[in-house]
């Protein structure tokens, strides 16, 4: 078996950043995270096997990278046992597509050898599933990990992709060439270090979750302009919008511009099934209050008609709490209109 271990001195998020985001998702959490990625000889959990595990955890207050690579298929069980023991010191497992592939695959291999699952009682944070809502906002061509890395400006991958690594690993088994082994290990290293880099993209989700403070509000006669401060720095600037609104962000600041109609704004609401739309008044009313309205004058609200009107008054422009409440209701709808 090939075993590697080394400290990570740069290119990985600091402890406080990881603690902030993992704590945001999991309240009962002791801050013992581990990032991991696996390499297998195929997708089938029954006919292929695990040959490499890479992980990053905290040791002596330092991010440390670990790898275990099988030099033959008989070493799979040994790697599984070592990884299981390794995971005992961690309670939050961070992966990319781990809940759909890595973890189910590993659980099947543990079962094959009659070994208990090391995932019992562990918290899982799958960055693929968690970051998926950002695809449209950040104009990502796909949700593959290298696509996210490229958005962040990381274009220095030098090793082969996962599919090509399978053939490289098979070549290594035949030739015992450690140059080939290093290529396989290098690909896994890039994948695991990439997890740390795209982890910071969780900051964009603060926009969706209303985790910001309004720092500026202005109405120029046609548009409402709001500026927001996030609790973290964005790893890369972005901009997006359509005919209704425009959103741009850099570092901790996000700027929001939305068109008004006659100095009024549409405030959208979730759960349109709970509202009636009144076409003559161009607004909605809760069903609990609208049951007495003639059916000729009401319709079932849709996500596009589930709104009331908001006046850009001086009182509104001088009240950050009202502005945030407006955004909390309206921004999720507007983000959903992006294509």
Where are these regions (language model features)?
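DEDD superfamily 3′-5′ metal-dependent exonuclease/proofreading module
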Residues: 1-36, 41-48, 58-339
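Short beta-strand scaffold segments in enzyme catalytic cores
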Residues: 53-55
């Amino acid at each position: 078996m090939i075993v590697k271990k080394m400290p990570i001195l740069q290119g990985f998020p600091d402890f406080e950043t990881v603690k902030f985001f993992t704590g945001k998702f999991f309240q009962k959490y002791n801050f013992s995270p581990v990032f991991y990625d696996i390499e297998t000889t195929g997708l089938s959990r029954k006919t292929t096997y695990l040959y490499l595990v890479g992980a990053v955890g905290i040791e002596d207050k330092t991010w440390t990278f670990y790898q275990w690579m099988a030099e033959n298929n008989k070493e799979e069980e040994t790697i599984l046992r070592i990884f299981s023991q390794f995971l005992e010191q961690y309670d939050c497992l961070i992966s990319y597509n781990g809940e759909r592939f890595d973890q189910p695959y590993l659980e099947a291999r543990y079962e094959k050898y009659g070994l208990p699952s090391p995932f019992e009682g562990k918290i899982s944070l799958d960055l693929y599933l968690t970051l998926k809502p950002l695809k449209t906002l950040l104009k990502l061509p796909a949700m593959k990990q290298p696509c996210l890395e490229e958005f962040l400006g990381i274009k220095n991958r030098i090793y082969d992709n996962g599919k090509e690594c399978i053939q490289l690993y098979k070549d290594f088994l035949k030739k015992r060439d450690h140059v080939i082994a290093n290529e396989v290990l290098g690909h896994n290293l890039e994948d695991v270090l990439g997890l740390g880099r795209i982890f910071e993209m969780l900051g964009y989700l603060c926009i969706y979750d209303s985790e910001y403070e309004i720092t500026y509000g202005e109405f120029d006669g046609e548009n409402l302009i709001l500026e927001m401060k996030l609790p973290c720095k964005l790893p890369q600037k972005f901009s997006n919008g359509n005919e209704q609104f425009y959103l741009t962000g850099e570092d901790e600041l996000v700027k929001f511009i939305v068109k008004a109609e006659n100095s009024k704004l549409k405030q959208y609401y979730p759960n349109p099934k709970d509202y009636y739309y009144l076409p003559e008044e161009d607004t909605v009313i809760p069903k609990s209050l609208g049951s007495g309205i003639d059916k000729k004058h009401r319709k079932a609200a849709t996500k596009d008609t589930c709104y009331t009107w908001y006046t850009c008054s001086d009182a509104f422009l001088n009240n950050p709490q009202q502005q945030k409440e407006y955004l909390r209701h309206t921004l999720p709808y507007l983000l959903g209109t992006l294509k």
